[in-house]
Amino acid sequence: MTALRIGNGYDIHRLVGDRPLILGGVTIAHHLGLDGHSDADVLTHALMDALLGALSLGDIGHYFPPSDARWQGADSLKLLAQVHQLILERGWRINNLDNVIVAEQPKLKPHIQAMKENLAKVLTIDPDLIGIKATTNERLGPTGREEGIAAYSVALLIKEG
């Protein structure tokens, strides 16, 4: 029997001035960026939580607490590489990933392929195993009011051997 594990992740960060907007490791031209202790890449953060959750390893706050100065301004793709290593060490590999980014602005479709390629490179998987969609919240809630950007992720892992 094939062993499978599934994990879900979610993250949201406030939009502020004087910060870059980074999603999936892609810096996107926009007048606002995401506020956070690290680079505030909500897509990569949600994905890390999904991967950790699939193996009951807690969440990114456990591994990269905002109270720790080492993670100030950290590149989330480098943190993702560390999370990926935890999965590999336990004998699991990624079967596929599915992600949704919720943002009113900017339009993200032109950047999705680059996000997939960045994540795939770090995770050493084919970009076709990573789904990324962008949607709006139809002007409802904090993302709809353009106060922040959120991301949801699902990770399906398969046991090696």
UniProtKB/Swiss-Prot annotation:
Manner of cofactor binding, per the entry note: Binds 1 divalent metal cation per subunit.
Residues annotated to bind a divalent metal cation: 11, 13, 45
InterPro entries: MECDP_synthase (IPR003526), MECDP_synthase_CS (IPR020555), MECDP_synthase_sf (IPR036571)
Gene3D superfamilies for this protein: 2-C-methyl-D-erythritol 2,4-cyclodiphosphate synthase (3.30.1330.50)
The organism's place on the tree of life at top rank: Bacteria
Pfam families xrefs: YgbB (PF02542)
Reaction(s) the record says it catalyses: 4-CDP-2-C-methyl-D-erythritol 2-phosphate = 2-C-methyl-D-erythritol 2,4-cyclic diphosphate + CMP
A GO molecular function held by the record: metal ion binding
Keyword Metal-binding: yes
Tagged with keyword Nucleotide-binding: no
Function noted in UniProt: Involved in the biosynthesis of isopentenyl diphosphate (IPP) and dimethylallyl diphosphate (DMAPP), two major building blocks of isoprenoid compounds. Catalyzes the conversion of 4-diphosphocytidyl-2-C-methyl-D-erythritol 2-phosphate (CDP-ME2P) to 2-C-methyl-D-erythritol 2,4-cyclodiphosphate (ME-CPP) with a corresponding release of cytidine 5-monophosphate (CMP).
Family: Belongs to the IspF family.
Subunit structure: Homotrimer.
Record protein name field: 2-C-methyl-D-erythritol 2,4-cyclodiphosphate synthase
Organism per entry: Synechocystis sp. (strain ATCC 27184 / PCC 6803 / Kazusa)
